Amino acid sequence: MGMPSGQELLIILAIVVLLFGAKKIPELAKGIGKGIKNFKAEMKNEDDDTEVKSASTEAPKKVESAEEVASKESSKTPTQA
């Protein structure tokens, strides 16, 4: 079961012409071509997006410890004794 031979391709073409008509075939081929072109463009855009995301990763922000937060809060509010 490999590629169809020339005679088999002619039979397939004849069936397609009978099913869709000679006028519809160019429209179908054009639609298929546009679909393939759009698919390839979206795949390229997806690859570009992943490259941009990986290149633009930022360094993680520093997480303050509870002691640092407490010392900042205590310096902001005056203590009353």
Curated annotation (Swiss-Prot):
Residues 45-81 are annotated as: Disordered. Keywords: Cell inner membrane, Cell membrane, Membrane, Protein transport, Translocation, Transmembrane, Transmembrane helix, Transport. InterPro entries: TatA/B/E, TatA/E. The keyword Transferase does not apply. It holds the Pfam family TatA_B_E. Its main location: membrane. GO terms for molecular function: protein transmembrane transporter activity. It is found in: Cell inner membrane. It comes from the Bacteria. The chain crosses the membrane at residues 1-21. It is a single-pass membrane protein. Residues 59-75 have a biased composition (Basic and acidic residues). Belongs to the TatA/E family. Part of the twin-arginine translocation (Tat) system that transports large folded proteins containing a characteristic twin-arginine motif in their signal peptide across membranes. TatA could form the protein-conducting channel of the Tat system. The Tat system comprises two distinct complexes: a TatABC complex, containing multiple copies of TatA, TatB and TatC subunits, and a separate TatA complex, containing only TatA subunits. Substrates initially bind to the TatABC complex, which probably triggers association of the separate TatA complex to form the active translocon. This is Sec-independent protein translocase protein TatA.
